[in-house]
Amino acid sequence: MPDVTRQETATRHPLLTRQNTIINDFKGYEKLYMIGGNSGWANMNALIRRSIDDVRLYDERDWKSPQVDVWGISDLDLFKESDRILRALPADKPFFAYVQTAGNHRPFTIPKDNDGFQVSDKTVEQVQAAGSRSVEQYNAVRLLDFNIGRLMELAKAGGYYENTIFVLFGDHNTRISQIPHMAPAFEQLGLESNNVPLLIHAPGLLGTRVVDEAVGLADLLPTLAGMAGMDFTSGTMGRDIQQAAPEGERVVPLVLREGTFPLIGGVTRNYLLQMEHDGSSPTLHDLSSPTPLDNVAEQNPQEFERLRDLTPGLHETSRMMLYQNVR
């Protein structure tokens, strides 16, 4: 569900770390969580251990590889050691594994042992024109792409590539620079931090598809359960994106300004409705417009009315579910 807490993050709240999760509906699966550094960051280990039944959690204390920076071992070493763990599992038992990378996060470390990855010698002007803030960041993103390729090679060599659904996503974005190929709305309406990549890769199982609706990370677990053919019960906000949304065109709730008095939003493929947390000052914005700050509520009264009702409902339901979903 969306984290709509108004102080810190939900994982830091000791009463919210024991949540019902669809992961527990993956009956008969080995469940693993691997992170290159300290799993105690933001109290994540409490959430993982208390919410996921029989989970095997691996962090910096379990790895043989050297730490390269504050985030622990390198992503490449994390992939290699995780691959060895997955290969050692019983061949007839499925697994649900979460591998948390950190290499494209500051300080953008390029480890010495990187399987031949070549740093690109670009100028600051060149990388900033393409959307990166620094040469270091540019090469860190390139390294992440390289490492994902190595992960796929390891999975193929390990014999589990063809029967595995790989999910690649970012937990959040960050302001980098103004990017010409992105619509002005992402910068001017503050959507860049919420706009993250999401790739589901299983060519032998799923084929190919582009989802052009607005979807959120809360939709990820029910979607994966649907793809795996699992029966599941959800007490949270996520929906299987393979199924039609009951509200018609799908709406994703957002928090656009955090804090005690947040600015909340409901985003669709084409529009963003934003309002104060108490429902006041609602405005509707066209995401494809060259002037996205314009309020287009009068030109689109039906969509404005639909989102004006849904947005606070989704936000307040998310707040309630953080407590109602506790096991």
Please give the residue ranges for each predicted region:
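Solvent-exposed soluble domains appended to multi-pass membrane proteins
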Residues: 1-327
